[in-house]
Structures are given as C-alpha cells and as structure tokens.
Curated annotation (Swiss-Prot):
Boundaries of every FAD-binding PCMH-type domain copy: 67-241
The protein, known as: Reticuline oxidase
Compartment(s) of residence: Cytoplasmic vesicle
Highest taxon in the source lineage: Eukaryota
InterPro entries on file: BBE, FAD-bd_PCMH, FAD-bd_PCMH-like_sf, FAD-bd_PCMH_sub1, FAD-bd_PCMH_sub2, Oxid_FAD_bind_N, Oxy_OxRdtase_FAD_BS
SUPFAM superfamilies recorded: FAD-binding/transporter-associated domain-like
Cystine pairings recorded for this chain: C30-C89
Gene designation: BBE1
Record location of the 6-(S-cysteinyl)-8alpha-(pros-histidyl)-FAD (His-Cys) cross-link: H104-C166
PANTHER family: OS08G0158400 PROTEIN
First-tier enzyme category under EC: oxidoreductase
Amino acid sequence: MENKTPIFFSLSIFLSLLNCALGGNDLLSCLTFNGVRNHTVFSADSDSDFNRFLHLSIQNPLFQNSLISKPSAIILPGSKEELSNTIRCIRKGSWTIRLRSGGHSYEGLSYTSDTPFILIDLMNLNRVSIDLESETAWVESGSTLGELYYAITESSSKLGFTAGWCPTVGTGGHISGGGFGMMSRKYGLAADNVVDAILIDANGAILDRQAMGEDVFWAIRGGGGGVWGAIYAWKIKLLPVPEKVTVFRVTKNVAIDEATSLLHKWQFVAEELEEDFTLSVLGGADEKQVWLTMLGFHFGLKTVAKSTFDLLFPELGLVEEDYLEMSWGESFAYLAGLETVSQLNNRFLKFDERAFKTKVDLTKEPLPSKAFYGLLERLSKEPNGFIALNGFGGQMSKISSDFTPFPHRSGTRLMVEYIVAWNQSEQKKKTEFLDWLEKVYEFMKPFVSKNPRLGYVNHIDLDLGGIDWGNKTVVNNAIEISRSWGESYFLSNYERLIRAKTLIDPNNVFNHPQSIPPMANFDYLEKTLGSDGGEVVI
C-alpha cells in the first residue's frame, strides 16, 4: 500500500501522563512492550496534543461541548499488528473501545461514550493499494473517501468506485453501514462491492474473509460500524467508468408552489431514470422563496444527458452550459465543491463549522404534493433547516434485500433527509432547532414507510432509542429492546445480524447504544476462532 506520513505523538509525554492519569495499570506497559508507541492521554488543557487530536476529526461541533465525555487516551495504530495489539492491551483493563475512521458518526458514537473509554483513531491507517490487473484495491479503513478516490484517479482514468460524495467521510464507517452515493443507481452500495476484508476481533485475531466466515463477512458489509471488531482494511472491486462523465449543479430560487411542483415530478424522474443517471436535490427556504439545488450525474456525454432531461424533466430549464463534461475523479471533486482533484486527498478539509442534527426517512410510495408543500412550508419558517433527497431505482432495485444487511432495495423509492444546523453564536437556540426537526419528522410520518418506519444506519439516530450496556437488567432483554431500531435499519436482516454478532463478539466488547446485541446465555463466552490470540496470516 502507498505509504503516507503518519501523525505522531510524543512518547515521553505520554509515558509521564498516562501513569498519572490511569493509575499505573497495565495499559502503558502493554502498549510499549507490543511496539504501539503513537498515543496520548487525557488532558484538560485545550492546547494539548490530546485535545488537538481529539477535535481534529470531529465533524459535528455538536459533540465538542465541554460536557461531552472524553476518552482516557487516544491511540493511533500504524499497522494491522499495532491495531491487534492495541485491542489486546485495552482489553486487559475495563475500558470501552471506540473506533474512529473519519469522525462523521451523526451521533458522535465513534468518539464518545457514557463509560470510561479509549479512542482508537485509525487516521494513520490510510493507505490505498490499487491492483489494475485484477481491478481491485485494498483500502485501509482510516482512509477517507477522498483519499480513496484520489488514489484511483492517480492510477486509472477508466476505473472508479461507488460511495458517498463527501470526501472527508472515513471508509471504515461508511462501508460498514452500506455506503450510498451518486453511483449507487449504477453499481449499488460501496458494501455491495467489497470482496474481502481484514477484521481484528475482540481477541486481537487478524481475520480475512475465509477466517471470519461468511456470516460475519456478510454482517460487516452494512451492519453498522463499531460492532463486529476493528476493520483494518477492505478489498474492493473497482468499477468501469467512461473517460468522460457529465455533471451539473444548478440552483433554482422559486416560489413554494413551483418548488412543490418540481419536487413532486422530481421523485418520479429520479427513480425511473436509466441507471446511468442520478438526480439528487438539496433544498431550503426562507419566508420569501425556496431554493432547490439539483445535482445531476451521468455516465456519458452531455449530449445524451441534455436530450434525456429535455425530454423527461423540461421544467428544470437546463441549458447546454449547465452540463459539464469531466473525468470521474473531477466530477466527485466538483460535486463536493472542490476546485481540484488533489483536494480530495486532504482529509482535514472542513466544509461546514456548524453543529447539526439529522433524521432520515425512506419511502415506498410516491409522496403527495401536500407532503412536499408542508415540508417546504416548515422549511420557510426555519432558515437553518434544509433537506437532501435521493432517488433509488436502477441497480438498487435489482440487488436482493439480503445480499448485504442493507435491506432497502426493490420497492424503495426515495431517501429523504431532514437537517438543521446552527453556528456557535446560535447555541442558545439548540433546543428550538431540535424541536423544529422533530416536528418536521412527525409531520412526514403519514407519508413515509410504516411498520416499521425505515431508517439507514449510516444516518444513525438515537431518538429511535438506545441500550445502556451497563444496566444488566436491560442487557438481558437487549435483543427485543434493540428490535425497534434494528428492524428500522435492517428489517428481517436484523435476526441474521444477531447470529453474526454472537459468532464474532459474544462478550459484546464492541458496542454502542444502537449496536447489534449478541444472544444472551451463549454456550461459550469466548468464540473458538482466535480465542488463543493466534493470528490468521493475511
């Protein structure tokens, strides 16, 4: 894999502080003995290395509050062996483990916990190795989507990958939750295109696909992050792309009635377009007008794109100058608002400094005009709110609902995301913003999926509930308690995920408030595979 310059802490500072902060337990000596030297310890000093690196990958300032729990230490492994040894050393104590890839967990679950915890930050595991002959790549899970896209574009103009468009999202968490993006109508989710993986389990065993078994390999590709162990790397299938694709990003400022009409028609066009096309919408409003930004993507030349939208959606009023031809890599930089492809390789870009909260729905039936009108009406009363709309269809409808844990395939029409964001100066209105979002979500209830109301684990939402794993009474009924959100995210795949969790992590070492629970009273406490700490050589 390509070598990148890792980020290091001062070992001497860590040695002195950890002994004081952690009471002379075994963690320091264990890490040192096993060659894990890149780490720092909790400090209340805002200028310390600890706080600088803690906040470096926090993508939602909502979780930078001084009242939010902080890890006892941050460890940055630089290899799969260091990652394995880190897990083994942490398990000698009583800490909860948190794994952070890009820091985009919508609920901050990759870097917060209600119990004392150690943060394993994967940012130094960000190498990408491209094999053009097999058209595959090994991607370390600390790589961001932008780093992955950049590595692909540097190697080939005819290959790409299907995943999200935000370049600072980590591949570890994104693929673990499925990974929807602008190419999903053509090639499915990111997780649909994973052909192997390396997982470090709770015992520190290093497992490839064969060693972990097909049930666990199935589970890690869409069953949510931070649940099964630590993903060291994904082996992905690279996908054919033309040398030129067509994109557009056009904003229309219109009255609410016209916006309602456009969105009502958009939902049919977005789902029914050929799979070579994607048309998504971002939107917001104020008291005077609605703004709708149309994001279009086509696997081909702009002449075909223009003739298609002229025929199917003339109301957009697109002109030839709106359609831009560029390479696949350039298109993802453009859609992310970047000026150059090389900027994709910068994992520390900050696109928005506002705190935010988001909720999501998936629809099975077309939304009526009154749903769009009511949604826009509510947006007009909250300028800090906005929406993101994505159509499914295409290849998404052809993949079986149990191919991976992500079940929202045939029959799923739209994914509708509701967001509210605010600046630090508006922090006093936080409760007001969250109340507005909850009322929008409640308003949409009659129009979206039911029994259960569907969600997407990469848009994890603790409003749906959570488990206090320290409460033994609750834990004994965890499978039924977790069912409400488990079936919302995974439908009937929830049951298979429970079985996979019981196989790979029966002691529930890797957990968070909405993680998949293992079966209680399992026949053995430590799974046979890797229980002696032995490694499977990859």
